[in-house]
Amino acid sequence: MKIYYDEDANIEIIKGMNVSIIGYGSQGNAHANNLHESGVSVTVGLREGSSSWAKAEEAGLKVQTVADSVIQADLVMILAPDEFQKNIYETEIKPNLKTSAILAFAHGFNIHFEKIVPEATNSVIMIAPKGPGHTVRSTYTNGGGVPSLIAIYEDALSDEDYSAKDVALSYAKANGGTRAGVLETSFKEETETDLFGEQAVLCGGLTALIKAGFETLVEAGYSEEMAYFECLHETKLITDLIQEGGIANMHYSISNTAEYGDYVSGPKVITSDTKKAMKGILENIQSGKFADDFLNDCRQSNDGTGGPVMKSNREATKIHPIESVGAELRSKMKFLNSQKLVDKEIN
């Protein structure tokens, strides 16, 4: 599989376009500011009254309503939350989109599951940084980048001197992606593997494992503080080693005792039943059931902040003992407070 770097992308392509970034959340903030600082003409499209309007203006960005930002755009990057994208596209983007404009996404959810069906005259591409927006922004400002994926769903640029893939690479370069490396995939592959990774391993699997470990120690009489350190705080130390050089690299770095414990106890936690459950999760994603369940839950929201399933679980997480003991311990760790990835005042 080819990996594309800075020398493989022509940043002048995206610098010659008017780019509309729809949304100013974690990813929208990163993309808009990174492209702006790369010399791209960027307009942030937001709904009137959005709390993000002032934040974007304070960052030195041009801000307009979604409809107004789209009218003159050559490329529209839709970075609003997945559950809002279809309505925004149908009501504000589609009626104002230039015939030849390029639609871009950072996740294939709405295209792959056919919630958004673009016109045939619009090229459809994906530039998907493989990291949270806060990381995309912080690595860019530090001179680095986050590995990214690109995908082409529709290339309608037959009259141009460049292809939709050239545009995707150019955008990725302006966003810092080619500093780290860019891989090409498909909307289907990105969507299904991304959702599976989030649910079974990175978010759902990991947080459930952390909480179960914490609860096991506390229920056995150990202090919440020690349980927090052993089951949550140290995860970064281990995942950094894995990310750097793989699982064997982590094994090389840890003690023989820890390595032996990995081999004999890990399979008792992650069993054949766990893998069977993972396959069920993947099947729900592939069939579109997860997408429909998620969107149905969102439709029951009165304020746009999540439906009953989302809200009940979000509140349960907030009151879990690991959150309160963690907040107290982190407040005493000065090294954690020096450079935060998430600053809710600006992103």
From Swiss-Prot:
PROSITE patterns for the chain: KARI_C, KARI_N
Cofactor note: Binds 2 magnesium ions per subunit.
Domain spans labelled KARI N-terminal Rossmann: 1-185
Record-level Gene Ontology MF annotations: ketol-acid reductoisomerase activity; magnesium ion binding; NADP binding
Binding positions for Mg(2+) 2 per the UniProt entry: 194, 230, 234
Positions of substrate binding: 255
Gene Ontology biological-process annotations: isoleucine biosynthetic process; L-valine biosynthetic process
Keyword Ion transport assigned: no
Pathway involvement of the protein, from the record: Amino-acid biosynthesis; L-isoleucine biosynthesis; L-isoleucine from 2-oxobutanoate: step 2/4; Amino-acid biosynthesis; L-valine biosynthesis; L-valine from pyruvate: step 2/4
Chemical reaction(s) catalysed: (2R)-2,3-dihydroxy-3-methylbutanoate + NADP(+) = (2S)-2-acetolactate + NADPH + H(+); (2R,3R)-2,3-dihydroxy-3-methylpentanoate + NADP(+) = (S)-2-ethyl-2-hydroxy-3-oxobutanoate + NADPH + H(+)
One cellular-component annotation, GO: cytosol
Binding site for Mg(2+) 1: 194, 198
Residue ranges constituting the KARI C-terminal knotted domain according to the UniProt record: 186-336
Sorted UniProt keywords: Amino-acid biosynthesis, Branched-chain amino acid biosynthesis, Magnesium, Metal-binding, NADP, Oxidoreductase
Keyword Amino-acid biosynthesis: yes
Residues involved in NADP(+) binding: 24-27, 47, 50, 52, 82-85, 133
Enzyme Commission number(s) of this protein: 1.1.1.86
Annotated TM spans: none
InterPro entries per the UniProt record, alphabetical: 6-PGluconate_DH-like_C_sf, KARI, KARI_C, KARI_N, KARI_prok, NAD(P)-bd_dom_sf
Coiled coil: none
Cofactor: Mg(2+)
Family, as annotated: Belongs to the ketol-acid reductoisomerase family.
HAMAP family, sorted: IlvC
NCBIfam families (alphabetical): ilvC, PRK05479.1
Function in brief: Involved in the biosynthesis of branched-chain amino acids (BCAA). Catalyzes an alkyl-migration followed by a ketol-acid reduction of (S)-2-acetolactate (S2AL) to yield (R)-2,3-dihydroxy-isovalerate. In the isomerase reaction, S2AL is rearranged via a Mg-dependent methyl migration to produce 3-hydroxy-3-methyl-2-ketobutyrate (HMKB). In the reductase reaction, this 2-ketoacid undergoes a metal-dependent reduction by NADPH to yield (R)-2,3-dihydroxy-isovalerate.
Name of the molecule in the record: Ketol-acid reductoisomerase (NADP(+))
Organism: Gamma-proteobacterium EBAC31A08
Designated gene of the protein: ilvC
